[in-house]
């Protein structure tokens, strides 16, 4: 076995001595050594309970006859990091997590690993590591938070963000805002809507690297603990059969993930993460592939922020496997693919029927005939931008308005709260891209403020930064090339007319090409905002959002 490198033979007596210093017996050392990669901490509500998940995983590993060895990786809470310099450090942790797992697994020569993430960048970071290291691996996340309630009204973290805007506009009282603060997040788990964390946890299931139920079983349910024990048992089987991520993460598996992403109306951040994961196994997911899948895949779910349902509702309606079953009825999935269950996709989903068609629409009665995410292009975004079409108000599907240009999310947030944004405006936030930010911050505070003050159905927002999975509205992110690389977004001036046409997938700056070129030529050289530390190194190595913001 792989771990024999560090434990077998007389010459490995020093290494065995070190294992014994931690209390491992000869029998434990002889067994397969399984890394339990935990992202537990006391900072992130989605991770506060992962110690229990890890204990269940380790119990499963021991039941199956192997030896678990746990180590931890970092995890950032995007909600706490939102709206200040901390958000620059969110996306960049994806690479830190992947790199640190690679280092630990290669240094200690584990036979397999169980990955325990839950929140936004930790899930893709761990999946990138699994693809890169390519030893038997399975992912078991911490599960979604339950939705909050105030009386008979359901709420979530996004309700609080939007409540800030509503309070500033005089639409709710301080007591109302405090009630949201107290009740929106009732306990542990990843935030309860179809935001980035839950989207990625669902897609881990679809890719075949997590067991059915991983994306939707609520964090507080005993079923989550049982699933963790099953994951621990299953990794030993994967090691025995030498089934690796490269056997599972095929082109067809990524096409399945994109199809389910479109059906769920998932987070725009998946358009960064799936290409980055695919890149590790030599697969290029370009934006044209994403649009082609969106064009043929119906949108079956409208979960928060696009609708009123939450992940717990999706779970009780049949979960991700039921959504996949619906898609399979029109041949929209590849069914003969390997998964960590030891069964094919088709075998996994054959009995997964929808239990509530109010939550998961039938395939012949979708919310729309095309997917929830769309890639748009035009002279403002030659290399593409992404919009969550399923969360766009109908009247903003096609829009023309004057640009209001800002250099940071904080500037926009302040302008919105001070009533300086008018109906019809097209907000442009630039120099927030992977290099320009650096770190490609999310713009949840500005978009939530727009919703709170009542402008979300009348104002569009365009940025080379990102959006939270909790964002709703006509919000176009990942504009590429970014402003820091002299993309056309750097040429926009206040008052320029911008045209949006989501159905035709266009984003147009109504300025002659010669004038755009002239404006870009006279721009001063971009000056990095951060000149030391990890952020500085990241800004030098990161590539365009159109590639998944991977590192050189």
Curated annotation (Swiss-Prot):
NCBIfam families: ilvD, PRK00911.1. Homodimer. [2Fe-2S] cluster binds at residues 119, 191. Functions in the biosynthesis of branched-chain amino acids. Catalyzes the dehydration of (2R,3R)-2,3-dihydroxy-3-methylpentanoate (2,3-dihydroxy-3-methylvalerate) into 2-oxo-3-methylpentanoate (2-oxo-3-methylvalerate) and of (2R)-2,3-dihydroxy-3-methylbutanoate (2,3-dihydroxyisovalerate) into 2-oxo-3-methylbutanoate (2-oxoisovalerate), the penultimate precursor to L-isoleucine and L-valine, respectively. Belongs to the IlvD/Edd family. Signal peptide: none annotated. The lineage of its organism: Bacteria, Bacillati, Bacillota, Bacillota incertae sedis, Caldicellulosiruptorales. Keywords: 2Fe-2S, Amino-acid biosynthesis, Branched-chain amino acid biosynthesis, Iron, Iron-sulfur, Lyase, Magnesium, Metal-binding. GO terms for biological process: isoleucine biosynthetic process; L-valine biosynthetic process. It is an enzyme of class 4 (lyase). This is Dihydroxy-acid dehydratase. Its EC number is 4.2.1.9. The keyword GTP-binding does not apply. The gene is ilvD. It comes from Caldicellulosiruptor bescii (strain ATCC BAA-1888 / DSM 6725 / KCTC 15123 / Z-1320) (Anaerocellum thermophilum). Pathway: Amino-acid biosynthesis; L-isoleucine biosynthesis; L-isoleucine from 2-oxobutanoate: step 3/4; Amino-acid biosynthesis; L-valine biosynthesis; L-valine from pyruvate: step 3/4. It holds the Pfam family ILVD_EDD_N. The modification N6-carboxylysine is found at residue 121. Its cofactor is [2Fe-2S] cluster; Mg(2+). Binds 1 [2Fe-2S] cluster per subunit. This cluster acts as a Lewis acid cofactor. The keyword Transmembrane helix does not apply.
């Amino acid at each position: 076995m792989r771990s024999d490198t560090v434990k077998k033979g007389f010459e490995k007596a020093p290494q065995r001595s070190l294992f014994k210093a931690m209390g491992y017996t000869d029998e434990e050392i002889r067994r397969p050594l399984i890394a339990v990669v935990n992202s537990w901490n006391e900072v992130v509500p989605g991770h506060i309970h992962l110690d229990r998940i890890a204990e269940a995983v380790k119990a499963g590993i021991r039941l199956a006859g192997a030896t678990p060895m746990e180590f931890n990786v970092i995890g950032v809470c995007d909600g706490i990091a939102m709206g200040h310099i901390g958000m620059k450090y969110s996306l960049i942790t994806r690479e830190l997590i992947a790199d640190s797992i690679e280092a630990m697994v290669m240094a200690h020569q584990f036979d397999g690993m169980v990955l325990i993430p839950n929140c936004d960048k930790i899930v893709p970071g761990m999946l990138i590591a699994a693809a890169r290291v390519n030893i038997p691996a399975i992912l078991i996340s911490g599960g979604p938070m339950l939705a909050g309630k105030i009386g008979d009204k359901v709420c979530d973290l996004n309700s609080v963000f939007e409540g800030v805007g509503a309070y500033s506009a005089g639409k709710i009282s301080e007591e109302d805002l405090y009630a949201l603060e107290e009740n929106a997040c009732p306990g542990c788990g990843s935030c309860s809507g179809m935001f980035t964390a839950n989207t990625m946890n669902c897609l881990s299931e679809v890719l075949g690297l997590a067991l059915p139920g991983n994306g939707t079983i609520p964090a507080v349910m005993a079923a989550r603990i049982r699933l963790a024990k099953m994951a621990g048992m299953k990794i030993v089987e994967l090691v025995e059969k030498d089934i690796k991520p490269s056997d599972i993460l095929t082109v067809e598996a990524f096409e399945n993930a994109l199809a389910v992403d479109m059906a769920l109306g998932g987070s725009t951040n998946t358009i960064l993460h799936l290409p980055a994961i695919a890149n590790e196994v030599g697969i290029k997911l370009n934006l044209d592939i994403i649009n082609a899948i969106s064009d043929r895949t119906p949108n079956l779910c409208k979960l928060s922020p696009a609708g009123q349902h939450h992940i717990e509702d999706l779970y009780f309606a049949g979960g991700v496997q039921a959504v996949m079953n619906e898609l399979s009825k029109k041949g929209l999935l590849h069914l003969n693919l390997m998964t960590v269950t030891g069964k094919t996709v088709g075998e996994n989903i054959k009995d997964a029927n929808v239990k509530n068609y109010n939550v998961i629409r039938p395939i012949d009665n979708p919310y729309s005939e095309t997917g929830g995410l769309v890639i748009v292009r035009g002279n403002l975004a030659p290399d593409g931008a992404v919009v969550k079409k399923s969360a766009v108000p109908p009247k903003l599907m096609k829009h023309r308005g004057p640009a209001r240009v800002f250099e940071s999310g904080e500037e926009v947030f302040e302008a919105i709260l001070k009533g300086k944004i008018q109906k019809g405006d097209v907000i442009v936030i630039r120099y927030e891209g992977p290099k320009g930010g650096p770190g490609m911050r999310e713009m949840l505070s500005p978009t939530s403020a727009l919703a709170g003050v009542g402008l979300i159905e009348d104002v569009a927002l365009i940025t080379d930064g990102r959006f939270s999975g909790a964002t709703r509205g006509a919000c176009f992110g990942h504009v590429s090339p970014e402003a820091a690389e002299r993309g056309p977004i750097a040429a926009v001036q206040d008052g320029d007319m911008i045209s949006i046409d989501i159905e035709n997938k266009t984003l147009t700056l109504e300025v002659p090409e010669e004038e755009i070129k002239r404006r870009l030529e006279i721009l001063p050289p971009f000056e990095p905002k951060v000149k030391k530390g990890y952020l500085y190194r990241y800004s030098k190595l990161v590539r365009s959002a159109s590639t998944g913001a991977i590192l050189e």
